[in-house]
């Protein structure tokens, strides 16, 4: 699962801040995935009884409330670091195009810090939750459908042959079956 989480996190970080996670052994990877998993548990329909039993909200010793506050502090720390890093790169003119930079540079957008943070949180938690689940589901599906794997392999071999690299920088996704398979898995 860490490789799938790294893919999800790298996609979210690249799209929103124009950076990637170097490896699944990095401290940033560990911190973000841990905190976002904990926050996801709080948002779960079964993970936080305080949402359904109001009396539990009055408990001053609630572990959930303390843990939620701790996760908020930790999340704010890495969000702040990612935002400062992007601000530095934008100031130097070395940033790559990304959602956050595009919104900041858009004179008509005029979003405040809270709105930018909301976009960032949506990209981060939404990406980790959905992409990770999606890729795991797709791998599970393919593991039970060797006929789909065989058809994809045959389509790739017909298109590229045995002497060409399958994943070149010039790949224009002309392999119709594989492109359709990916789109179907993304639904």
Name these PLM-found stretches.
Residues 1-135, 151:
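Cytochrome P450 heme-thiolate monooxygenase catalytic core
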Residues 30-38, 94-102, 141-187:
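Cytochrome P450 I-helix active-site segment
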């Amino acid at each position: 699962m860490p490789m799938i989480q790294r893919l999800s996190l790298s996609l979210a970080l690249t799209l929103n801040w124009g950076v990637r996670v170097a490896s699944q052994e990095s401290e940033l990877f560990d911190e973000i995935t841990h905190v976002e998993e904990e926050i996801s548990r709080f948002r779960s329909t079964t993970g936080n009884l305080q949402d359904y039993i109001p009396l539990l909200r009055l408990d001053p010793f609630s572990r959930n409330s303390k843990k939620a506050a701790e996760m908020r502090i930790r999340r704010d720390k890495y969000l702040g670091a990612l935002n400062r890093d992007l601000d530095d790169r934008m100031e130097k003119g070395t940033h790559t195009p990304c959602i956050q930079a595009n919104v900041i540079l858009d004179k008509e957008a005029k979003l405040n810090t809270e709105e930018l943070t909301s976009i960032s949180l949506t990209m981060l938690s939404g990406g980790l939750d959905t992409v990770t689940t999606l890729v795991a589901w797709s791998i599970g599906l393919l593991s039970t459908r060797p006929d789909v794997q065989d058809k994809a392999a045959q389509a790739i071999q017909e298109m590229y042959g045995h002497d060409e690299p399958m994943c070149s920088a010039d790949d224009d996704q002309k392999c119709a079956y594989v492109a359709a398979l990916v789109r179907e898995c993304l639904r």
